[in-house]
Regions:
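Charge-rich, solvent-exposed alpha-helical interaction surfaces
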Residues: 84-91
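Acidic, low-complexity, intrinsically disordered interaction modules
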Residues: 15, 20-80, 84
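Short arginine-rich
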Residues: 92-97
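Short acidic DE-rich linear segments
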Residues: 98-102
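A short beta-strand micro-motif
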Residues: 5-13
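GIY-YIG nuclease catalytic motif and its immediate N-terminal context
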Residues: 2
């Protein structure tokens, strides 16, 4: 179960005028969790209200398929993963990653 002690991670991708991607790793503290009849919403200061099912499915993709990192999708951040994702984003900013479709 998710609580306000958990954090949300997000890898943002933007392009400059030369069409070169730049990445930023954002960590957001959970302000509150709203359990409703139809869905459970997670609220942070940085993001719009997030659906818990979407967060859990993205986090499960990270856990089950090692080596694949999804950008522009929020996920539940584990305590030991923050340094890893920051290192990946720093490496991507030095040398942009290739798409899996290349």
């Amino acid at each position: 179960m998710i609580t306000t002690k958990n954090r949300i991670g997000y890898i943002q991708r933007r392009y400059d005028e030369n069409n070169v991607p730049h990445f930023k790793f954002i960590v957001a503290k959970i302000k509150r969790v709203n359990i409703g009849v139809k869905s459970t919403k997670v609220y942070t200061k940085e993001f719009y209200p997030l659906d818990l099912e979407d967060l859990e499915s993205t986090t499960e993709m990270f856990d089950t398929s090692k080596g694949i990192i999804i950008v522009q999708e929020p996920f539940i951040l584990k305590d030991d993963e923050e340094e890893y994702f920051q290192a990946v984003v720093d490496r991507w900013n030095e040398e942009p990653p290739k798409s899996i479709f290349d």
